[in-house]
Amino acid sequence: MALWGGRFSQGADSRFKQFNDSLRFDYRLAEQDIQGSMAWAKALVKVGVLTADEQGKLQQAMEVLLASVQQDPQQILISDAEDIHSWVESALIAAVGDLGKKLHTGRSRNDQVATDLKLWCKAQGELLLGSITALQQGLVASARANQAAVLPGYTHLQRAQPVTYAHWALAYVEMLERDYSRLQDALKRLDTSPLGCGALAGTAYAIDREALALDMGFAGATRNSLDSVSDRDHVVELMHVASLSMTHLSRFAEDLIFYNTGEAGFVELSDAVTSGSSLMPQKKNPDALELIRGKTGRVVGAQMGMLMSLKALPLAYNKDMQEDKEGLFDALDTWHDCLDMAALVLIDLKVNGERTMAAAQGGYANATELADYLVAKGIPFREAHHIVGETVVYAIQVKKPLEELTIGEFQRFSPVIEFDVYPNLELEATLAKRVAKGGVAREQVEAALIAAETWLAKRAG
C-alpha cells in the first residue's frame, strides 16, 4: 500500500506506478534508511511519542531487518513497494504490527531521503578515500621499483626534455592527492543532518536535532529546514570530484596506452589486464586502460545531467530530485572501479628501461641544455634559443645527435662553443641540473619519493 493512499479514490495506473517507483535503485539506501529510523525512534521517545518499551521493540525489529538486508539486499527488489522508505516501513509493520505505523510521526520522506542519501555519501566517500590512497601507493611502489628508468618527456606529443619514470608516476600521485583533498572537503560540507526538517517547514515535535545528528554520526544538524530538503549540492560536488578525478585517470590511462604501443614500447601490460582479438592472434589490447579512458565521459555526463535536473528547480522537494540517485550511484561506482583497476594495472607493469633511455636520448631533447650553455657564456637567452634552433636544423640535415657534432660544426653557429659543451649534453647531466624543488634531478625525485612514502604510510597507519 502506498504511504499516501488516503487522499486518492482511484488507484495508480500500472504504467505510472512503474514510471514513478524508485525502489529498483534506491534499495541501495536500505541500510541508511534503517540507521536513520533507529535514531528517529530514539528521538521520538524523548518527545513522548514512543515509550522506551516501544522503542526497544522497534530497535530489535530494525536490527533484525538490517542484518537481513546486509546479507541479501536483492530481496528488497521482489517487493512492489514504491521506494525504500515504503519497504522498510512495511517490513516493520509486518514485524511489530501497528507499532510500526508510529515510527513516521513527525517525519517526511523529504527529510528522510535527504538524510539517507547523505549517510550513503559519507560511507561511499570513505571507501573512495581508501581507493585513492591505494592507487597512490601503487604509483609510489612502481616509481621506486623503476627509479633508474629515464623517460622522454613530451609536450604536444613531441619529445621535449628527459624526465624519469619515477617523476612521471609521482606527477599522478600529486593529481590524486588533490582529488583526495577535494573529496575530504566535499565530505566535510555534507556532514550535516537534515532529519527533523519535515517536508519543508520543520517538524511539529520538539526534536533535539543536534543530538539526533550526532546519534547518526553527523557533525551536526542543518540550519534551515527549507534549504535542507532542497539541497543536493553534495550530490553535485561528489560528482564533480569524481569527474575531475576520472579526467586525471583518463590522462594516466592515455599515457600508458601510448607507452604500451609497439611504436613506443616503453612499458608492457600484464596479461591479467589485457585482452586479445577475435581475428588477429598477435594482438594484446590495453582494454583496462581504454575502459578507464572511456568511462570518464560517463561520469562527466552524469554530473552534467544532475546539474540540468536541478536547474531552475523551485525550493523544497520536487519529484525531479528522484533523478539524483541513479547518476550519483553510477558515477561513484564507476570512479571506485576505475581507481581499483588503475591500481591493478600497476601491479605487474613492466618498464623497458632500454627503450625509454633510447627514446630519451633521441629527438634532440638536450637542445635546451645547449641553450643554457650559451647563456652561461654570456649570450642572451632569446639569441641562444635562435642559435640552437639553427644548430638543430643542421644536425637533422647531417643526421647526427647534438652530442656527436664536432667543435667545428658547433662553431659554425657560435664561436663561444668550446669542448666543455659535451658534458652538458649528456643525459644524466641534463637531469642533474633540474635541482629546484619539484625538478627531475635524481636527488629531488628521491626526496619526493621519500616524502610520498612517508605521508602515505602515515595515512594508511
UniProtKB/Swiss-Prot annotation:
Pathway annotation from the record: Amino-acid biosynthesis; L-arginine biosynthesis; L-arginine from L-ornithine and carbamoyl phosphate: step 3/3
A Pfam family this chain is assigned to: ASL_C2
Intracellular or extracellular location(s): Cytoplasm
- EC number(s) reported in the record: 4.3.2.1
GO CC annotation, single? cytosol
Keyword Metal-binding included in the entry's annotation = no
Q: Does the keyword Ion transport apply?
A: no
Q: Which SUPFAM superfamilies match?
A: L-aspartase-like
GO BP annotations of the record are: arginine biosynthetic process via ornithine; L-arginine biosynthetic process
Family, as annotated: Belongs to the lyase 1 family. Argininosuccinate lyase subfamily.
Protein name, as recorded: Argininosuccinate lyase
Q: Which organism is it from?
A: Aeromonas hydrophila subsp. hydrophila (strain ATCC 7966 / DSM 30187 / BCRC 13018 / CCUG 14551 / JCM 1027 / KCTC 2358 / NCIMB 9240 / NCTC 8049)
